[in-house]
Amino acid sequence: MASRGEKTPLTMTMMGGPIDARKSPTAVNNLAMNKSHNWFENNVIFRVPGNFPGAGRRVYPGFMQHAGFVAMNPDRHAKSHYDYFKDLIKGDGASVEAHRKFYDEYNAVLDMDANYYLETIRTVFQEFKLVHGSWDVLNLKGQPERVRPQDIRTTALMTVEGELDDISGSGQTAAAHDLCTQIDKSMKQHLEVEGAGHYGIFSGRRWRDAVYPQVKAFIAKGQARLEQESAPAKRSKSAAPATKSVRAATKTAARPTASRSPRKSAARSAKMG
């Protein structure tokens, strides 16, 4: 949008995403970099079975995604479920409900389109096309366009990272600031959430208390900036009619007032007499 000269959003908030996956590589990054593109296509892509909606589609199945998430921290998940069992015995309803709510969201996964998944692996985690300035995407006309974050100027940028994020490592999301070189420093903000993992910046107490208030304030600041920039234009427009009125009044005042000739007035007076 910015490269085409179109209007861009007031603000852009990027959270826990691998803008530059080379920084602080995690287990996810290492897997993507150490396996070939063909390996992913041959080992994690399957077709939807015939008795399910979308039968025959090639996908990265949700159950494999879930298994991968759990395998990253098996001890932590085992302890969480053990604590859940103890809380049930103690009758700690609040802790039990918090556990259920978290895992209801954590376990909710969807099959991912194969082409989308494989392209993401190659573009983001293997070839780093965005940071190398070599990423092309198709526009609505089917024509390739280069992605140029350096063309963004009027959109404020906020990035959010979790201190303990083991999926998108430290600095991977903040790298967006280095790419968006034309955004003024006053319109940039970075937040690192202390003690938060990847999911912590999106949900739960840390999201409610540490992340959401700042994101909300950042968006409101962008709206206020727009209103402030629009104010002079509004004032000049409202002043225009008043200027026209003043000009009209000036012309009226300058126009000579019609007066009767003294001779004609005297003649009329004589006739009346």
Per-region residue spans from a language model:
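Conserved alpha/beta-hydrolase "acid-adjacent" motif
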Residues: 166-175
